[in-house]
Amino acid sequence: MKIAFIGEAVSGFGGMETVIRDVITTFRQQHIQSEMFFFCRNDKMDKGWLEGIKYSCSFSNIRLGFLRRAKHIHALSKWLQEYQPDIVICIDVISCLFAAKARKKSGIDMPVFSWPHFSLDHKKHAEYITCADYHLAISSGIKQQMINRGVAESTINVIFNPVETKDSVIPAPEEGETATFIYVGRMKFEGQKRVKDLLDGLSQAKGNWKLHVLGDGSDFEKCQAYGRELNIDDRIVWYGWQQYPWELVQQDIEKVSALLLTSSFEGFPMTLLEALSWGIPCISADCVSGPADIIQPDVNGHLYQPGDIAGFVTLLNKYIAGEIHIEHEKIPASIDEFYQSKYYDRLHKVIISAISRRK
C-alpha cells in the first residue's frame, strides 16, 4: 500500500510534525510506503523533522491566489501520476481542495482524507474540508466542527493522536516540599496559549510554588517581563526551547505536582498526553478542542472554563495545599486508548475500509 501525505509547509517544531513523522515511521515498519508533498511559497521550511522521509515540494510565490493555487494543483497532479498512491491524506484544509482538483486532473481515482491538526474555527478556508471523501478527527471537538461545516458524520472517524508508553513515572513532591508546576509549549502571551492567564493565576495562588517553563516563541521576553511585573519571577525557571523536554523534566526537575495548560483553543494538546503518560496530572482550560477527551476530573487532572482565572486559582490552591490526591502511578492507565498500539489499530482499520469501499 502507498500513502501520500500532502499539506502546506510547516514550521518543523510542533506536535503535528511529531505525530506525522511517527505515523510514517510506523507505517514503514508495517511495510506501508509513505511519501509527502508540500505546497511552499519559499524554501525556508525546516526539514530536520523529515529525515528519512521521502518528500517533494511545489514552490510558488505568485501573489495572485488563484494562479498560485493553479500551479500547486498542476504540480500535485503530475506527482500523483508518478507516485500512484492508494490513498491521499491532507494535513490541512486547503490541501483538501488541491487534492480533489489534482485527483480529477490526474485521472487517478483514490480516496482523499482530511486530517486537520488545528481547530477549524480558527483556520482560514475551513470550508474546504468538505472536498475530502473521509475525515480523520483528532478530537471530538474537531469532529463537531466538521459536522457544523456540512461533513456527513458517517465519513468521520475520531482517531485522536498517539503517545508512547513510558517505563517510569515522575512523582509528586513529598508532603511539605514546594509544589512544582510545569508548562511545556509555545510562548504566546495571549492569543492561543494565553501564558498571561497562567502567570495571572499563579500570582494569585496561596502558598509555596515553583514554575518551570519549557518552550520558546515570539512572546518569550514579554512573558518574562510580565512575570517580573507580577513579582513572581523569582519562582519561575525559564528554559527556552528544549529538543527533549521530558528528559529534562525527568532528570532535572524530578518531581512535579501538575502540568498547566491555559489555552483559549487547541487542536489536540499532545503536551497533556505526554504529561499523563509520565504520571503527571494536568490542570487545563476546557477549551475547544481536546482537553475534555483527555482529562478525567479527579482521575488524572482537572478542567476549568477558559478565561475563568478564579476557577484556575482555586485548583492551583488545592494542589499547592495538598488537598488533591491523585496517585501518579495510576495516571498512565487513564489514557490507555491513546497509546500507540491502539491508535495504529484504529488508523489502519479506517484506511483499509476506505480503500475497500473505493474498489
UniProtKB/Swiss-Prot annotation:
Record's keyword terms, sorted: Glycosyltransferase, Lipopolysaccharide biosynthesis, Transferase
Functional pathway: Bacterial outer membrane biogenesis; LPS core biosynthesis
Name this polypeptide is given: Lipopolysaccharide 1,6-galactosyltransferase
Sequence similarity: Belongs to the glycosyltransferase group 1 family. Glycosyltransferase 4 subfamily.
InterPro entries documented for this protein: Glyco_trans_1, Glyco_trans_4-like_N
GO biological process per UniProt: lipopolysaccharide core region biosynthetic process
Enzyme Commission code: 2.4.1.-
Pfam families: Glyco_transf_4, Glycos_transf_1
Top-rank EC class of the record's enzyme: transferase
GO cellular component entries: cytosol
Molecular function as annotated in GO: lipopolysaccharide-1,6-galactosyltransferase activity
Catalytic function, reaction form: alpha-D-Glc-(1->3)-[L-alpha-D-Hep-(1->7)]-4-O-PO3(2-)-L-alpha-D-Hep-(1->3)-4-O-PO3(2-)-L-alpha-D-Hep-(1->5)-[alpha-Kdo-(2->4)]-alpha-Kdo-(2->6)-lipid A + UDP-alpha-D-galactose = alpha-D-Gal-(1->6)-alpha-D-Glc-(1->3)-[L-alpha-D-Hep-(1->7)]-4-O-PO3(2-)-L-alpha-D-Hep-(1->3)-4-O-PO3(2-)-L-alpha-D-Hep-(1->5)-[alpha-Kdo-(2->4)]-alpha-Kdo-(2->6)-lipid A + UDP + H(+)
Function: Galactosyltransferase involved in the biosynthesis of the core oligosaccharide region of lipopolysaccharide (LPS). Catalyzes the addition of galactose from UDP-galactose to the first glucose residue of the LPS outer core. Cannot use other sugar donors, such as UDP-glucose, UDP-glucuronic acid, UDP-galacuronic acid, GDP-mannose, ADP-glucose and GDP-glucose. In the absence of a lipid acceptor, can hydrolyze UDP-galactose to UDP and galactose.
Gene3D superfamilies per record: Glycogen Phosphorylase B
Coiled-coil stretches: none
Keyword tRNA-binding on entry: no
Positions annotated to bind UDP: Q242, E274
